[in-house]
Amino acid sequence: MAPTMRKSHPLLKIINGSFIDLPSPANLWAWWNFGSLLGVCLVAQIVTGLFLAMHYTADTSLAFSSIAHICRDVNNGWLLRNLHANGASFFFICIYFHIGRGLYYGSYLYKETWNIGVILLFLVMATAFVGYVLPWGQMSFWGATVITNLLSAAPYIGSDLVQWIWGGFSVDNATLTRFFTFHFILPFIIAAASMIHLLFLHQTGSSNPTGLNSNLDKVSFHPYFSYKDLFGFVIMLGALASLSTFAPNLLGDPDNFTPANPLVTPPHIKPEWYFLFAYAILRSIPNKLGGVLALLLSIMVLFRMPIIHTSKLRSLMFRPIAKTFFWALIANTAILTWIGGQPGEDPFITIGQIASGLYFLIFVLLIPSLGLLENKLLKI
């Protein structure tokens, strides 16, 4: 019998092993869709971004008007711009659900896959930050100034580092040009890192909701999960299209419709909604260096998850006490997101400090101690 081409061709057999004949646990459900949704988001962002880059001008005197030109004069430019801006929000919605699922079902015990995933999160955040500067509106300019200025908190090299990133003594033309360069190249680095992420995942196979070994009960990825993922694509792309056409500016900041002016500070400088939880943690510490370290640690704490897992059970499905504190962490992160969007005054600062303390308390102390407690209660 002639060999099947998808199993014998050097290139097709890699695709076949990753997306067609891949043995997958039979009990995966909707929470496992978000990895593929992130792939769709990345492709959508690269495609819309390439078309926008054809018409965008990375110059302080032309950037804002080039965005207006895209929206007014370019054929379907308004749609491209709205899809790209709101696509970033959907990207972060999917990435946070993906991380949440990993925390809930113990996916972080696949250490290499998890660590590459956290690096990917940093890359996506960096891409979103430099991208937000490109329209050169008020919030773009002041957001770039405030966030890059945080690097001056680094001992000895801080002020030199900031000027090196700015390309001068303030956020100006050189800054915008290099930020555009980074925004263009980073998605391709993310795509390469995503392939490494998948490579490590396929070494171990996917986890499943029970956290048990699923080698006895596996099905091929296609057609079962490929169609399930396709259903997710339709829902997400439908939601993205609806938001981009009916309420395109819902998640944006009104200040960004004003051209950047270094002489006028906006009344309340804040990043996009997906960074607000980290911004609230940064703002909750009065010391500049302490705030920057807390900001970094709020994401880097994810690297510790495989180390601080003390439970003999993998998934939270069978851990009622730890499950309660997982949802407390989700609620706490939602409170931090709300606080990050509020003015820097009481009672918001106090609430932010309490929520920031709880955030680190859950990660650093409660997760390992609850694992040990449950082992003792279950006598395992």
Swiss-Prot record:
Subcellular location: Mitochondrion inner membrane
Keywords: Electron transport, Heme, Iron, Membrane, Metal-binding, Mitochondrion, Mitochondrion inner membrane, Respiratory chain, Transmembrane, Transmembrane helix, Transport, Ubiquinone
Superkingdom of the organism of origin: Eukaryota
Signal peptide positions (record): none
Binding-site residues, a ubiquinone: H202
InterPro entries, alphabetized: Cyt_b/b6_C, Cyt_b/b6_C_sf, Cyt_b/b6_N, Cytb/b6-like_sf, Cytochrome_b, Cytochrome_b_C_euk/bac, Cytochrome_b_N_euk/bac, Di-haem_cyt_TM
GO process terms (BP): mitochondrial electron transport, ubiquinol to cytochrome c
PROSITE patterns: CYTB_CTER (PS51003), CYTB_NTER (PS51002)
Major location category of this protein: mitochondrion
Family: Belongs to the cytochrome b family.
Quaternary structure note: The cytochrome bc1 complex contains 3 respiratory subunits (MT-CYB, CYC1 and UQCRFS1), 2 core proteins (UQCRC1 and UQCRC2) and probably 6 low-molecular weight proteins.
Name of the protein in its database record: Cytochrome b
Organism: Aquarana catesbeiana (American bullfrog)
Species classification: Eukaryota, Metazoa, Chordata, Craniata, Vertebrata
